[in-house]
Amino acid sequence: MQYIFHLVLFIFCVQISLAQEKSFGGLQDWQLQSLHSSSTRSISSLAGIWEISYDGKNWYKSTVPSAIKDAKKLYYRRTFDLTEEERQNNSWQLLFLGIEEEIEVSINQIYVRQYIGGMSPFYIQLPDKMLKSGKNLLEIVVSKPSQGFYKFKQQYEFSPSTYCGIPRDPVLIGTPSLWISGFKSTQSFSNNYTNAAINTNVSISSATLEKLGRLRSDSTKKTSAVFDKMSASVQIEVKHPDGQILTNVVSPQTIEILPERTLSIPISFQIPNPQLWSVESPNLYTITVKIIQNSITIDELTYPLGLRELKVGPDKKQLFMNGKPLFIKGLTYFEEYGLKTGITVSPNLLEQDVKNLKLLGANAIKLQGKAPNPYLIHLCDKYGILIFVDLDVFDMPSSIVSSSEMQIEMQNSIERYITAYERNPSIVAWGIGEGLEESASSTGKYTKDFSAFVKQRSSKLLYRTIRFGANAPNSDNSQLDFYIFRSTRQVSDNIDREIKEVKRIEKSFEGKPLIFLFGKLVQTNNKNGYSDPLSAEAQAKYLRDFYKLIKSGTYAGLVVWSYNDYSIRRPIFTTNSPDASKIATSGLVDVFRNTRLSYTMIQALFNEERDPLLRAGTYSESMPIGFVVLGLVATFAFLFMISRLRRFREYVVRALLRPYNFYADIRDQRILSLSQTVVLGIFISLTVGLILSAFLYFARTNNDVDFLFSLIIPWNEVKEFVDNLIWNSTISIISISIITMVLFYAFAVFLRLIAILFAKRVLFYDTFIIIVWSCLPLLFILPLAAVLVKIVTSTFSLMIITTLLVALFVWLFYRILRASAVVFDVDSFKIYAIGGGSIVLSLAVIMMYYSYEYGFVSFFYYVQTTSF
């Protein structure tokens, strides 16, 4: 009895778990109808339980849609049923609402083909000969591209996490043998928006001759022999937002089509006194396209139609919607929820987000990096939210922007976007790049060529997002409609500096509307008051100050980064949040939609209400005690040894003033104290630890330094360890000191190998002495290293001290080579050649590897030229 009870309990828990997983994805039938409305088609969501495998051998059950963070390759399979009538009378397609990676599709163990997802919706035609009545096995292999442009386009700062899987619903669609395969529309207005001219292009596709013959037989109620063409009429039915059908608007078009062909039919009509779509009144007409033969509707499909016009105003400073100025109040939005479900977001949650955006007073969202979810677009059409869609070109060096692979990738992406989204009224603009090198000629050429490519295919506006500090506009930007400027996103913001930059931008970039993108990271659960730059109050204050700055000028709008927190590909150290190092905490709400103080602030600002009071707090930054304590202890210990140990004092004097004699003694086997050498090495290592830790502590809130660290340290676990060290100065000093001591031993081993090359009887003990005592001059900056964290307070002081330290380390390297020549008793030129050549060769190999794998040289130069 107890066994049965536990079994029932287990089954119940599994069902609850599956139901909870299901709640994060999977469109209900009525939601699916809002995306693909037809009474003549079989439309079935394939969301539900699938089999999934990491290797194609070991399978387990899981839900679809779903995606797994950082997975490289996944195998999916499930079956679906077709009756004999369904198989014979319909043509079957798979509709994927969004897959980011490459996929391979097989039906009944027969390979169909490979497709590239890109997260935009796409159809896969299932060949008739591969289908059978009864159960059909659908197999999908999803894999991430690992080479080329895909690898580099994920490198940018705050790049969202990558997922592998099927994050949005797959849909099985059965169409008649003659079906509507595409619909495009453009619109224009006249007589002060009292008349709308609609130009449409309807695509009609046909199946095989056998299926067309069967369709003709059904429609005529007579058996038909083999024929060449099929005749039908195409009709368009327009429904007013109030539900009434507009009569005598569109005339039917007669077509004749051959088997396995696609026709494009242009159909134009006018709507008098249209009800316009706007953010305040999102009025939606519907267009139902029908294929009719012998008074029988063969196929029909319904599309939304929002009549609106968004263009640049006559003053070239504002955007006008339907003839009226529109100030953009937007937020960047990331389709992600929680830490487990990731980019698989339930339709109900998407709708709740859109409703919250309206309550905030927002009228636009900016989507970064991924093609929008069709259901999200449907909701924005319904509720009146404008969408700015960014292509996946972010913070990219000019050498990558100019590559042919990148150009082809972007052209393919925008064509898929236009096919999927061009007819939606909420989609108003395409972003063709963010954070590019404005001074590079390749950026101008890319903008000119790609803008022309898009303008030929789309009626949407075009823009680029430009980093603060960029040069004057390139002449090749003429086809852009407006600019978005992105603030620094630094934790330690300087609002006065950004005020000056906004004014400079206004003068330098005249002639186009300007929108400003700004935001600030916050430390989770930090409520210390805005005196702490990582606090929730500091985020709210920054957003308030920047908002009022933009509202005080004649600008086209603003976009806040961001509505919600989102997971990122690489850990960051700028927020000192070990529990959230891989989350961009820039949101007004966190990943679970819990609101922050900045949510209340933006709601008040967007709705022109009284903004909430902010608490300053008593936070003040102080120098970490670890620098002073460890620095002073090491300094006094070193001075104590010099004053009390005569032999040690003599070694120090001779190593500094008479290095040749000092190392000649080593060559002649005059033994130095090993214990004193080890202690000296500890002091020197501690000095290096103090210096490097001071630099890291100074740069702990700098995004550019964090980005370079992400390039240098490509392993997330190691990067997280280093990030934690940066904020814990004592552990950082000790860790770097230990690493330095280990390097002393490693270099000593290397010198021992060089000695073997020269056939010299030099022991490891001797090479260790060479390394340690050659670095002796470092100890004389030990007192400076103890207080260096207080001296390095600006980029200018950092550059001066860095230059001096580089010169010092070059001198130390020279001392090591000179000492090696003396101890090895060989010509100095040979040692210099081998030592210098080894360093150059090692650096060259490392740089070649990093450049090939991560584009390090290109990205390093990019950071240098775009930093503000």
Region annotations inferred by a language model:
Residues 16-69, 141, 145, 241-243:
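Accessory carbohydrate-binding/adhesion or oligomerization-edge regions at the termini
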Residues 21-25, 36-37, 71, 76-181, ...:
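Accessory beta-strand-rich segments of carbohydrate-active enzymes
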Residues 66-68, 73-82, 90-95, 100-104, ...:
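Active-site-adjacent substrate/metal-binding segments within catalytic domains
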Residues 133-135, 224, 228-313:
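Extended acidic/polar, glycine-enriched regions
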Residues 445-553, 584-585:
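Extracellular glycoside hydrolase catalytic/binding regions
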Residues 562-620, 625-630:
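Aromatic-rich peripheral "rim/lid" segments of glycoside hydrolase catalytic domains that contact
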Residues 645, 649-759:
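Selected alpha-helical membrane-embedding segments in polytopic membrane proteins
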Residues 722-738, 747-855:
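Hydrophobic alpha-helical transmembrane segments and adjacent short intramembrane/lumenal linkers
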